[in-house]
Amino acid sequence: MAATLRELRGRIRSAGSIKKITKAQELIATSRIAKAQARVEAARPYSAEITSMLTELASASALDHPLLVARENPRRAAVLVVSSDRGLCGAYNANVLRQAEELFSLLREEGKEPVLYTVGRKALGYFSFRQREVVESWAGFSERPTYENAREIADTLVTAFMSGADDEGDDAGADGILGVDELHIVFTEFKSMLSQSAAARRIAPMVVEYVGDEQPEEGPQTLFSFEPDPETLFDALLPRYVATRVYAALLEAAASESASRRRAMKSATDNADDLIKALTLAANRERQAQITQEISEIVGGANALADAK
Protein backbone atom coordinates (compact mmCIF):
# COMPACT_ATOMS: atom_id res chain seq x y z
CA MET A 1 0.00 0.00 0.00
CA ALA A 2 2.86 2.40 0.88
CA ALA A 3 4.53 1.57 -2.41
CA THR A 4 1.32 2.38 -4.30
CA LEU A 5 1.01 5.76 -2.55
CA ARG A 6 4.65 6.54 -3.28
CA GLU A 7 4.10 5.63 -6.94
CA LEU A 8 1.06 7.91 -7.20
CA ARG A 9 2.96 10.84 -5.70
CA GLY A 10 5.80 10.23 -8.16
CA ARG A 11 3.36 10.30 -11.06
CA ILE A 12 1.85 13.55 -9.75
CA ARG A 13 5.32 15.15 -9.65
CA SER A 14 6.05 13.92 -13.19
CA ALA A 15 2.76 15.27 -14.53
CA GLY A 16 3.44 18.59 -12.81
CA SER A 17 6.87 18.85 -14.44
CA ILE A 18 5.41 18.10 -17.87
CA LYS A 19 2.68 20.68 -17.27
CA LYS A 20 5.30 23.37 -16.62
CA ILE A 21 7.01 22.55 -19.93
CA THR A 22 3.80 22.54 -21.98
CA LYS A 23 2.58 25.76 -20.33
CA ALA A 24 5.87 27.48 -21.16
CA GLN A 25 5.68 26.29 -24.76
CA GLU A 26 2.08 27.52 -24.97
CA LEU A 27 3.06 31.00 -23.74
CA ILE A 28 6.01 31.21 -26.15
CA ALA A 29 3.85 30.18 -29.10
CA THR A 30 1.16 32.68 -28.08
CA SER A 31 3.70 35.52 -27.99
CA ARG A 32 4.93 34.64 -31.49
CA ILE A 33 1.56 34.29 -33.21
CA ALA A 34 0.72 38.00 -33.27
CA LYS A 35 4.04 38.94 -34.87
CA ALA A 36 3.87 36.06 -37.34
CA GLN A 37 0.30 36.96 -38.30
CA ALA A 38 1.30 40.60 -38.85
CA ARG A 39 4.14 39.52 -41.16
CA VAL A 40 1.75 37.32 -43.14
CA GLU A 41 -0.72 40.18 -43.59
CA ALA A 42 2.10 42.51 -44.66
CA ALA A 43 3.51 40.07 -47.24
CA ARG A 44 0.25 38.97 -48.87
CA PRO A 45 -0.46 42.20 -50.82
CA TYR A 46 3.01 42.26 -52.38
CA SER A 47 2.83 38.58 -53.36
CA ALA A 48 -0.62 39.07 -54.88
CA GLU A 49 0.41 42.25 -56.68
CA ILE A 50 3.55 40.86 -58.31
CA THR A 51 1.57 37.82 -59.47
CA SER A 52 -1.18 40.05 -60.87
CA MET A 53 1.33 42.35 -62.55
CA LEU A 54 3.16 39.48 -64.25
CA THR A 55 -0.16 38.04 -65.40
CA GLU A 56 -1.14 41.34 -67.02
CA LEU A 57 2.30 41.79 -68.58
CA ALA A 58 2.13 38.26 -69.95
CA SER A 59 -1.22 38.88 -71.61
CA ALA A 60 0.07 42.12 -73.13
CA SER A 61 3.38 40.81 -74.46
CA ALA A 62 2.44 37.34 -75.78
CA LEU A 63 6.01 36.35 -74.90
CA ASP A 64 7.12 32.73 -75.08
CA HIS A 65 8.94 32.76 -71.74
CA PRO A 66 9.56 29.70 -69.48
CA LEU A 67 7.81 31.49 -66.62
CA LEU A 68 4.63 31.82 -68.67
CA VAL A 69 4.42 28.86 -71.04
CA ALA A 70 4.19 25.22 -69.99
CA ARG A 71 6.84 23.06 -71.64
CA GLU A 72 5.95 20.26 -73.98
CA ASN A 73 6.13 16.82 -72.38
CA PRO A 74 7.27 17.95 -68.90
CA ARG A 75 9.31 15.21 -67.23
CA ARG A 76 10.29 16.50 -63.80
CA ALA A 77 8.63 18.78 -61.24
CA ALA A 78 10.41 20.35 -58.28
CA VAL A 79 8.41 20.17 -55.04
CA LEU A 80 9.42 22.31 -52.06
CA VAL A 81 7.93 20.88 -48.84
CA VAL A 82 7.80 23.36 -45.93
CA SER A 83 7.73 21.74 -42.47
CA SER A 84 8.91 22.70 -38.98
CA ASP A 85 12.28 22.29 -37.28
CA ARG A 86 10.74 21.24 -33.96
CA GLY A 87 7.89 19.03 -32.85
CA LEU A 88 5.21 19.60 -30.21
CA CYS A 89 2.90 21.18 -32.79
CA GLY A 90 0.14 18.61 -33.12
CA ALA A 91 -0.69 17.36 -36.61
CA TYR A 92 1.03 20.29 -38.34
CA ASN A 93 3.81 18.25 -39.96
CA ALA A 94 1.65 15.19 -40.58
CA ASN A 95 -0.85 17.26 -42.57
CA VAL A 96 1.72 18.96 -44.78
CA LEU A 97 3.55 15.67 -45.45
CA ARG A 98 0.26 13.99 -46.35
CA GLN A 99 -0.45 16.83 -48.78
CA ALA A 100 3.01 16.37 -50.29
CA GLU A 101 2.45 12.64 -50.80
CA GLU A 102 -0.85 13.37 -52.55
CA LEU A 103 0.92 15.82 -54.86
CA PHE A 104 3.63 13.24 -55.63
CA SER A 105 0.97 10.72 -56.62
CA LEU A 106 -0.77 13.25 -58.86
CA LEU A 107 2.48 14.24 -60.58
CA ARG A 108 3.40 10.61 -61.22
CA GLU A 109 -0.04 9.98 -62.72
CA GLU A 110 0.70 12.85 -65.11
CA GLY A 111 4.04 11.29 -66.05
CA LYS A 112 6.18 13.73 -64.07
CA GLU A 113 8.89 12.65 -61.65
CA PRO A 114 8.91 14.69 -58.40
CA VAL A 115 12.24 16.28 -57.48
CA LEU A 116 12.25 16.90 -53.75
CA TYR A 117 13.42 19.97 -51.80
CA THR A 118 12.62 20.48 -48.11
CA VAL A 119 12.47 23.23 -45.50
CA GLY A 120 12.57 22.13 -41.85
CA ARG A 121 14.14 19.16 -40.11
CA LYS A 122 10.88 17.22 -39.83
CA ALA A 123 10.38 16.90 -43.60
CA LEU A 124 14.03 16.01 -44.13
CA GLY A 125 13.83 13.32 -41.44
CA TYR A 126 10.59 11.94 -42.87
CA PHE A 127 11.90 11.51 -46.42
CA SER A 128 15.39 10.40 -45.36
CA PHE A 129 13.91 7.66 -43.18
CA ARG A 130 11.98 6.41 -46.22
CA GLN A 131 15.13 6.58 -48.35
CA ARG A 132 13.70 9.25 -50.65
CA GLU A 133 16.29 11.43 -52.32
CA VAL A 134 16.26 15.07 -51.20
CA VAL A 135 18.15 17.28 -53.65
CA GLU A 136 18.62 20.10 -51.15
CA SER A 137 17.27 21.02 -47.74
CA TRP A 138 17.19 24.08 -45.51
CA ALA A 139 16.64 24.17 -41.74
CA GLY A 140 16.95 26.38 -38.69
CA PHE A 141 14.51 29.17 -39.57
CA SER A 142 11.05 27.60 -39.81
CA GLU A 143 9.64 29.78 -37.00
CA ARG A 144 11.33 33.03 -38.06
CA PRO A 145 12.05 33.02 -41.80
CA THR A 146 13.65 36.02 -43.49
CA TYR A 147 13.57 37.22 -47.07
CA GLU A 148 17.22 36.17 -47.40
CA ASN A 149 16.20 32.59 -46.58
CA ALA A 150 13.50 32.75 -49.25
CA ARG A 151 15.88 34.24 -51.81
CA GLU A 152 18.45 31.50 -51.21
CA ILE A 153 15.77 28.85 -51.76
CA ALA A 154 14.40 30.68 -54.81
CA ASP A 155 17.84 30.94 -56.43
CA THR A 156 18.22 27.16 -56.20
CA LEU A 157 14.74 26.51 -57.60
CA VAL A 158 15.08 29.05 -60.43
CA THR A 159 18.43 27.57 -61.47
CA ALA A 160 16.86 24.11 -61.67
CA PHE A 161 13.81 25.49 -63.51
CA MET A 162 15.79 27.41 -66.13
CA SER A 163 18.15 24.45 -66.59
CA GLY A 164 15.22 22.21 -67.43
CA ALA A 165 14.49 24.14 -70.63
CA ASP A 166 17.32 22.49 -72.58
CA ASP A 167 17.21 18.99 -71.06
CA GLU A 168 16.86 16.15 -73.52
CA GLY A 169 14.92 13.13 -72.32
CA ASP A 170 16.18 12.01 -68.94
CA ASP A 171 19.61 13.56 -69.49
CA ALA A 172 20.96 16.98 -68.59
CA GLY A 173 21.19 19.61 -71.29
CA ALA A 174 24.12 21.65 -72.52
CA ASP A 175 24.57 23.30 -69.12
CA GLY A 176 25.19 19.91 -67.49
CA ILE A 177 22.45 20.48 -64.88
CA LEU A 178 19.50 18.11 -64.58
CA GLY A 179 16.68 20.63 -64.36
CA VAL A 180 12.94 20.60 -63.76
CA ASP A 181 9.96 21.71 -65.84
CA GLU A 182 7.67 22.88 -63.03
CA LEU A 183 7.97 24.40 -59.56
CA HIS A 184 5.52 23.46 -56.80
CA ILE A 185 5.42 24.36 -53.12
CA VAL A 186 3.62 22.52 -50.30
CA PHE A 187 3.05 24.49 -47.11
CA THR A 188 0.46 25.22 -44.43
CA GLU A 189 -1.83 28.11 -45.26
CA PHE A 190 -2.68 30.39 -42.33
CA LYS A 191 -6.36 31.36 -42.33
CA SER A 192 -6.93 32.33 -38.71
CA MET A 193 -5.78 31.52 -35.18
CA LEU A 194 -8.04 28.47 -35.20
CA SER A 195 -7.85 27.43 -38.85
CA GLN A 196 -4.82 26.34 -40.88
CA SER A 197 -4.74 23.90 -43.76
CA ALA A 198 -2.06 22.24 -45.87
CA ALA A 199 -1.95 23.53 -49.45
CA ALA A 200 -0.06 22.80 -52.67
CA ARG A 201 0.59 25.55 -55.22
CA ARG A 202 2.27 25.60 -58.62
CA ILE A 203 4.40 28.71 -58.91
CA ALA A 204 6.03 28.12 -62.31
CA PRO A 205 4.95 28.09 -65.04
CA MET A 206 2.59 30.71 -63.69
CA VAL A 207 -1.03 29.90 -63.04
CA VAL A 208 -3.35 32.86 -63.50
CA GLU A 209 -4.77 33.74 -60.10
CA TYR A 210 -7.27 36.34 -58.95
CA VAL A 211 -7.34 37.62 -55.41
CA GLY A 212 -10.53 36.50 -53.66
CA ASP A 213 -13.53 36.40 -55.96
CA GLU A 214 -12.49 39.33 -58.12
CA GLN A 215 -12.59 38.77 -61.85
CA PRO A 216 -10.92 40.84 -64.55
CA GLU A 217 -13.11 43.71 -65.65
CA GLU A 218 -14.57 43.64 -69.12
CA GLY A 219 -13.54 46.32 -71.57
CA PRO A 220 -10.30 47.64 -73.06
CA GLN A 221 -7.14 46.08 -71.69
CA THR A 222 -4.23 48.15 -70.38
CA LEU A 223 -1.47 48.78 -72.93
CA PHE A 224 2.10 48.34 -71.72
CA SER A 225 5.33 49.80 -73.05
CA PHE A 226 8.31 47.58 -72.15
CA GLU A 227 11.69 49.10 -71.28
CA PRO A 228 13.89 47.13 -71.66
CA ASP A 229 12.43 44.42 -73.90
CA PRO A 230 9.87 41.96 -72.41
CA GLU A 231 12.27 38.99 -72.34
CA THR A 232 14.90 40.89 -70.34
CA LEU A 233 12.19 42.16 -68.01
CA PHE A 234 10.81 38.68 -67.32
CA ASP A 235 14.31 37.25 -66.84
CA ALA A 236 14.84 39.86 -64.11
CA LEU A 237 11.42 39.37 -62.53
CA LEU A 238 11.45 35.56 -62.44
CA PRO A 239 13.83 35.19 -59.43
CA ARG A 240 12.02 37.98 -57.58
CA TYR A 241 8.62 36.46 -58.28
CA VAL A 242 9.69 33.00 -57.07
CA ALA A 243 11.40 34.48 -53.99
CA THR A 244 8.26 36.44 -53.15
CA ARG A 245 6.02 33.39 -53.45
CA VAL A 246 8.43 31.28 -51.37
CA TYR A 247 8.72 34.01 -48.72
CA ALA A 248 4.93 34.34 -48.46
CA ALA A 249 4.64 30.55 -48.04
CA LEU A 250 7.37 30.51 -45.35
CA LEU A 251 5.60 33.26 -43.41
CA GLU A 252 2.24 31.48 -43.62
CA ALA A 253 3.88 28.24 -42.49
CA ALA A 254 5.59 29.98 -39.55
CA ALA A 255 2.32 31.51 -38.35
CA SER A 256 0.55 28.17 -38.78
CA GLU A 257 3.29 26.37 -36.84
CA SER A 258 2.97 28.75 -33.88
CA ALA A 259 -0.83 28.47 -33.92
CA SER A 260 -0.67 24.67 -34.07
CA ARG A 261 1.91 24.53 -31.28
CA ARG A 262 -0.16 26.82 -29.07
CA ARG A 263 -3.25 24.69 -29.62
CA ALA A 264 -1.36 21.43 -29.00
CA MET A 265 0.38 22.73 -25.87
CA LYS A 266 -2.86 24.12 -24.43
CA SER A 267 -4.48 20.73 -24.93
CA ALA A 268 -1.49 19.02 -23.30
CA THR A 269 -1.59 21.44 -20.35
CA ASP A 270 -5.32 20.84 -19.85
CA ASN A 271 -4.77 17.07 -20.01
CA ALA A 272 -1.97 17.36 -17.45
CA ASP A 273 -4.33 19.27 -15.14
CA ASP A 274 -6.96 16.56 -15.46
CA LEU A 275 -4.38 13.84 -14.84
CA ILE A 276 -3.01 15.59 -11.75
CA LYS A 277 -6.53 15.94 -10.32
CA ALA A 278 -7.29 12.27 -10.94
CA LEU A 279 -3.97 11.13 -9.45
CA THR A 280 -4.38 13.43 -6.43
CA LEU A 281 -7.83 11.99 -5.78
CA ALA A 282 -6.45 8.45 -6.05
CA ALA A 283 -3.56 9.34 -3.72
CA ASN A 284 -5.93 10.84 -1.15
CA ARG A 285 -8.09 7.72 -1.24
CA GLU A 286 -5.01 5.54 -0.86
CA ARG A 287 -3.77 7.64 2.05
CA GLN A 288 -7.22 7.50 3.67
CA ALA A 289 -7.29 3.72 3.33
CA GLN A 290 -3.78 3.53 4.79
CA ILE A 291 -4.76 5.66 7.80
CA THR A 292 -7.93 3.61 8.33
CA GLN A 293 -5.89 0.40 8.31
CA GLU A 294 -3.37 1.81 10.79
CA ILE A 295 -6.19 2.87 13.14
CA SER A 296 -7.77 -0.57 12.84
CA GLU A 297 -4.45 -2.22 13.69
CA ILE A 298 -3.98 0.04 16.73
CA VAL A 299 -7.50 -0.63 17.98
CA GLY A 300 -7.07 -4.33 17.37
CA GLY A 301 -3.79 -4.35 19.30
CA ALA A 302 -5.33 -2.46 22.20
CA ASN A 303 -8.24 -4.89 22.37
CA ALA A 304 -5.85 -7.83 22.35
CA LEU A 305 -3.89 -6.37 25.29
CA ALA A 306 -7.12 -5.73 27.19
CA ASP A 307 -8.26 -9.31 26.67
CA ALA A 308 -4.88 -10.62 27.81
CA LYS A 309 -5.32 -8.86 31.16
Swiss-Prot record:
GO cellular component: plasma membrane; proton-transporting ATP synthase complex
Keyword Zinc-finger part of the UniProt annotation: no
Molecular function in Gene Ontology: ATP binding; proton-transporting ATP synthase activity, rotational mechanism
Subcellular location: Cell membrane
GO biological process: proton motive force-driven plasma membrane ATP synthesis
Principal cellular location given in the protein's record: membrane
Stored Gene3D superfamilies: 3.40.1380.10, ATP synthase, gamma subunit, helix hairpin domain (1.10.287.80)
Family annotation (InterPro entries): ATP_synth_F1_ATPase_gsu, ATP_synth_F1_gsu, ATP_synth_F1_gsu_CS
Quaternary state and interactors: F-type ATPases have 2 components, CF(1) - the catalytic core - and CF(0) - the membrane proton channel. CF(1) has five subunits: alpha(3), beta(3), gamma(1), delta(1), epsilon(1). CF(0) has three main subunits: a, b and c.
Function: Produces ATP from ADP in the presence of a proton gradient across the membrane. The gamma chain is believed to be important in regulating ATPase activity and the flow of protons through the CF(0) complex.
Family (UniProt): Belongs to the ATPase gamma chain family.
Name under which the protein is recorded: ATP synthase gamma chain
Organismal lineage: Bacteria, Bacillati, Actinomycetota, Actinomycetes, Mycobacteriales
Gene name for this UniProt entry: atpG
